[in-house]
Amino acid sequence: MNKFEKFLQEHFGEHEPREIEELVFDNFWVDKASFTIEEKKALEKYVNLIHLSLNNIGLKSLENLPSIKSLYYLSLKNNELSGDDFDKIKTLYPKLNKLKISGNVIEKMDNLMKLKPLKLRKIEVKENPFSVGNDKYIKKVFDMLPTLKIVDQTDKNGDEEETTDYHNEEKENEGDEDGEYDEEEEAEDKNKDNEEEEESEEKESDNDNSSK
Protein backbone atom coordinates (compact mmCIF):
# COMPACT_ATOMS: atom_id res chain seq x y z
CA MET A 1 0.00 0.00 0.00
CA ASN A 2 1.52 3.35 -1.07
CA LYS A 3 1.31 6.43 1.14
CA PHE A 4 -1.61 7.89 -0.81
CA GLU A 5 -3.62 4.71 -0.35
CA LYS A 6 -2.67 4.64 3.32
CA PHE A 7 -3.79 8.26 3.77
CA LEU A 8 -7.06 7.61 1.95
CA GLN A 9 -7.71 4.49 4.00
CA GLU A 10 -7.06 6.30 7.28
CA HIS A 11 -9.25 9.32 6.46
CA PHE A 12 -11.95 7.93 4.17
CA GLY A 13 -11.94 4.21 4.85
CA GLU A 14 -15.54 4.27 6.04
CA HIS A 15 -16.75 5.71 2.73
CA GLU A 16 -16.91 4.32 -0.76
CA PRO A 17 -14.64 6.27 -3.15
CA ARG A 18 -17.63 7.24 -5.30
CA GLU A 19 -19.15 9.04 -2.28
CA ILE A 20 -16.21 11.45 -1.90
CA GLU A 21 -16.35 14.83 -3.66
CA GLU A 22 -13.34 16.63 -2.16
CA LEU A 23 -9.73 15.57 -1.52
CA VAL A 24 -6.96 17.77 -0.12
CA PHE A 25 -3.34 16.61 -0.22
CA ASP A 26 -1.63 19.94 0.48
CA ASN A 27 1.99 19.59 1.72
CA PHE A 28 1.82 15.84 1.07
CA TRP A 29 5.06 15.54 -0.89
CA VAL A 30 5.40 13.06 -3.72
CA ASP A 31 8.63 11.05 -3.80
CA LYS A 32 9.75 11.55 -7.41
CA ALA A 33 8.43 15.01 -8.40
CA SER A 34 5.42 13.37 -10.08
CA PHE A 35 2.79 10.75 -9.34
CA THR A 36 3.52 7.06 -9.65
CA ILE A 37 1.25 4.66 -11.53
CA GLU A 38 0.10 3.24 -8.19
CA GLU A 39 -0.79 6.69 -6.83
CA LYS A 40 -2.61 7.54 -10.04
CA LYS A 41 -4.71 4.36 -9.83
CA ALA A 42 -5.49 4.98 -6.16
CA LEU A 43 -6.94 8.43 -6.87
CA GLU A 44 -8.80 7.44 -10.02
CA LYS A 45 -11.17 5.39 -7.88
CA TYR A 46 -12.75 8.69 -6.80
CA VAL A 47 -14.87 8.97 -9.91
CA ASN A 48 -17.24 11.66 -8.56
CA LEU A 49 -14.57 13.99 -7.24
CA ILE A 50 -15.30 17.70 -7.70
CA HIS A 51 -12.47 19.36 -5.77
CA LEU A 52 -8.82 18.22 -5.77
CA SER A 53 -6.09 20.20 -4.03
CA LEU A 54 -2.43 19.29 -4.57
CA ASN A 55 -0.70 22.40 -3.25
CA ASN A 56 2.98 22.31 -2.29
CA ILE A 57 3.65 18.63 -2.90
CA GLY A 58 6.79 18.95 -5.02
CA LEU A 59 5.27 18.35 -8.45
CA LYS A 60 7.54 19.12 -11.40
CA SER A 61 5.36 17.49 -14.04
CA LEU A 62 1.79 16.31 -14.58
CA GLU A 63 2.96 12.80 -15.41
CA ASN A 64 0.59 10.16 -14.01
CA LEU A 65 -1.77 12.78 -12.62
CA PRO A 66 -5.11 10.98 -12.05
CA SER A 67 -7.78 11.32 -14.72
CA ILE A 68 -11.06 12.38 -13.08
CA LYS A 69 -13.70 13.45 -15.60
CA SER A 70 -16.04 14.98 -13.01
CA LEU A 71 -13.45 17.39 -11.59
CA TYR A 72 -14.55 21.02 -11.37
CA TYR A 73 -11.82 22.59 -9.23
CA LEU A 74 -8.07 21.84 -9.32
CA SER A 75 -5.42 23.55 -7.23
CA LEU A 76 -1.72 23.02 -8.00
CA LYS A 77 -0.28 26.02 -6.17
CA ASN A 78 3.30 26.27 -4.92
CA ASN A 79 4.77 23.41 -6.90
CA GLU A 80 7.52 23.47 -9.54
CA LEU A 81 5.45 23.25 -12.70
CA SER A 82 6.75 24.96 -15.84
CA GLY A 83 3.54 24.55 -17.82
CA ASP A 84 5.22 22.63 -20.63
CA ASP A 85 2.75 19.77 -20.21
CA PHE A 86 -0.40 21.78 -19.47
CA ASP A 87 -1.97 20.33 -22.62
CA LYS A 88 -2.65 17.18 -20.57
CA ILE A 89 -5.14 18.99 -18.34
CA LYS A 90 -7.91 19.11 -20.98
CA THR A 91 -7.86 15.33 -21.36
CA LEU A 92 -7.61 14.64 -17.64
CA TYR A 93 -10.27 17.13 -16.52
CA PRO A 94 -12.59 18.10 -19.40
CA LYS A 95 -15.14 19.75 -17.07
CA LEU A 96 -12.60 21.86 -15.19
CA ASN A 97 -13.95 25.30 -14.34
CA LYS A 98 -11.46 26.69 -11.84
CA LEU A 99 -7.66 26.23 -11.85
CA LYS A 100 -5.04 27.51 -9.42
CA ILE A 101 -1.42 27.37 -10.58
CA SER A 102 0.10 30.31 -8.71
CA GLY A 103 3.52 30.01 -7.11
CA ASN A 104 5.00 27.72 -9.75
CA VAL A 105 7.89 28.27 -12.18
CA ILE A 106 5.98 29.21 -15.33
CA GLU A 107 8.28 31.44 -17.38
CA LYS A 108 6.59 31.14 -20.77
CA MET A 109 3.21 32.82 -20.70
CA ASP A 110 2.40 31.03 -23.96
CA ASN A 111 2.12 27.79 -21.98
CA LEU A 112 -1.23 29.08 -20.75
CA MET A 113 -2.51 28.79 -24.32
CA LYS A 114 -2.51 25.04 -23.78
CA LEU A 115 -5.46 25.61 -21.44
CA LYS A 116 -7.58 27.24 -24.15
CA PRO A 117 -9.53 24.06 -25.05
CA LEU A 118 -10.89 24.13 -21.49
CA LYS A 119 -13.81 26.40 -20.68
CA LEU A 120 -12.21 27.83 -17.58
CA ARG A 121 -14.10 30.47 -15.69
CA LYS A 122 -11.49 31.30 -13.05
CA ILE A 123 -7.72 30.97 -12.91
CA GLU A 124 -5.01 31.94 -10.45
CA VAL A 125 -1.53 32.46 -11.94
CA LYS A 126 0.21 35.04 -9.73
CA GLU A 127 3.70 34.54 -8.29
CA ASN A 128 5.04 32.89 -11.43
CA PRO A 129 8.12 34.29 -13.22
CA PHE A 130 6.04 35.62 -16.14
CA SER A 131 3.76 37.61 -13.81
CA VAL A 132 6.32 39.08 -11.40
CA GLY A 133 6.88 42.75 -12.23
CA ASN A 134 4.41 42.57 -15.11
CA ASP A 135 1.39 44.76 -14.41
CA LYS A 136 -0.26 43.86 -17.73
CA TYR A 137 -0.27 40.08 -17.38
CA ILE A 138 -3.88 39.88 -16.16
CA LYS A 139 -5.23 41.52 -19.31
CA LYS A 140 -3.06 39.24 -21.45
CA VAL A 141 -4.41 36.15 -19.68
CA PHE A 142 -7.97 37.32 -20.33
CA ASP A 143 -7.08 37.78 -24.01
CA MET A 144 -5.49 34.34 -24.24
CA LEU A 145 -8.33 32.48 -22.53
CA PRO A 146 -11.59 34.19 -23.56
CA THR A 147 -13.94 32.10 -21.39
CA LEU A 148 -12.36 33.46 -18.21
CA LYS A 149 -14.34 35.75 -15.93
CA ILE A 150 -11.78 36.01 -13.14
CA VAL A 151 -7.96 36.13 -13.18
CA ASP A 152 -6.21 36.33 -9.81
CA GLN A 153 -9.41 37.43 -8.03
CA THR A 154 -9.89 40.24 -10.56
CA ASP A 155 -12.60 40.57 -13.22
CA LYS A 156 -12.26 42.10 -16.69
CA ASN A 157 -13.16 45.54 -15.34
CA GLY A 158 -10.34 45.42 -12.82
CA ASP A 159 -12.70 44.90 -9.88
CA GLU A 160 -11.92 42.42 -7.13
CA GLU A 161 -14.18 39.38 -7.03
CA GLU A 162 -16.32 38.50 -4.05
CA THR A 163 -14.99 35.45 -2.23
CA THR A 164 -17.04 32.28 -2.66
CA ASP A 165 -16.28 28.62 -2.13
CA TYR A 166 -16.37 26.01 -4.85
CA HIS A 167 -19.60 24.45 -3.54
CA ASN A 168 -21.52 27.69 -4.11
CA GLU A 169 -19.85 28.21 -7.47
CA GLU A 170 -20.95 24.80 -8.65
CA LYS A 171 -24.56 25.47 -7.63
CA GLU A 172 -24.48 28.79 -9.48
CA ASN A 173 -23.35 26.99 -12.63
CA GLU A 174 -25.74 24.02 -12.58
CA GLY A 175 -27.86 25.58 -15.32
CA ASP A 176 -25.09 25.56 -17.90
CA GLU A 177 -22.67 22.75 -18.69
CA ASP A 178 -20.03 25.30 -19.67
CA GLY A 179 -20.17 26.91 -16.23
CA GLU A 180 -21.44 30.20 -17.70
CA TYR A 181 -25.08 30.39 -16.71
CA ASP A 182 -25.42 34.16 -16.37
CA GLU A 183 -28.27 36.60 -15.66
CA GLU A 184 -29.05 37.09 -19.35
CA GLU A 185 -29.53 33.36 -19.88
CA GLU A 186 -31.67 33.19 -16.75
CA ALA A 187 -33.89 36.00 -18.08
CA GLU A 188 -34.25 34.18 -21.40
CA ASP A 189 -35.32 31.01 -19.58
CA LYS A 190 -37.89 32.96 -17.57
CA ASN A 191 -39.31 34.48 -20.75
CA LYS A 192 -39.59 31.02 -22.28
CA ASP A 193 -41.40 29.76 -19.19
CA ASN A 194 -43.83 32.69 -19.34
CA GLU A 195 -44.51 32.07 -23.03
CA GLU A 196 -45.17 28.40 -22.37
CA GLU A 197 -47.56 29.28 -19.54
CA GLU A 198 -49.45 31.72 -21.78
CA GLU A 199 -49.72 29.12 -24.54
CA SER A 200 -51.00 26.58 -22.03
CA GLU A 201 -53.62 29.01 -20.73
CA GLU A 202 -54.77 29.82 -24.28
CA LYS A 203 -55.18 26.13 -25.06
CA GLU A 204 -57.20 25.59 -21.90
CA SER A 205 -59.41 28.55 -22.80
CA ASP A 206 -59.97 27.20 -26.32
CA ASN A 207 -60.86 23.79 -24.93
CA ASP A 208 -63.38 25.33 -22.53
CA ASN A 209 -65.02 27.33 -25.33
CA SER A 210 -65.25 24.33 -27.63
CA SER A 211 -66.84 22.20 -24.93
CA LYS A 212 -69.53 24.83 -24.44
Predicted regions and their residues:
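Recurring C-terminal helix/loop segment of individual leucine-rich repeat
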Residues: 12-15, 38-44, 60-67, 81-91, ...
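Canonical position 11/12 of the leucine-rich repeat
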Residues: 28-37, 58-60, 78-86, 96, ...
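A conditional alpha-helix N-cap/helix-loop micro-motif detector
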Residues: 1-5, 55, 82, 102-105
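Ankyrin-repeat and related helical/solenoid repeat scaffolds used for protein-protein interactions
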Residues: 89-129
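Residues that line or immediately flank small-molecule/substrate-binding pockets and catalytic motifs
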Residues: 27, 56, 66, 78, ...
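Conserved hydrophobic beta-strand positions in leucine-rich repeat
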Residues: 21-26, 47-54, 71-76, 97-101, ...
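The feature captures the LRR N-terminal capping module
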Residues: 1-53, 130-212
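Leucine-rich repeat
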Residues: 17-19, 45-48, 65-71, 91-95, ...
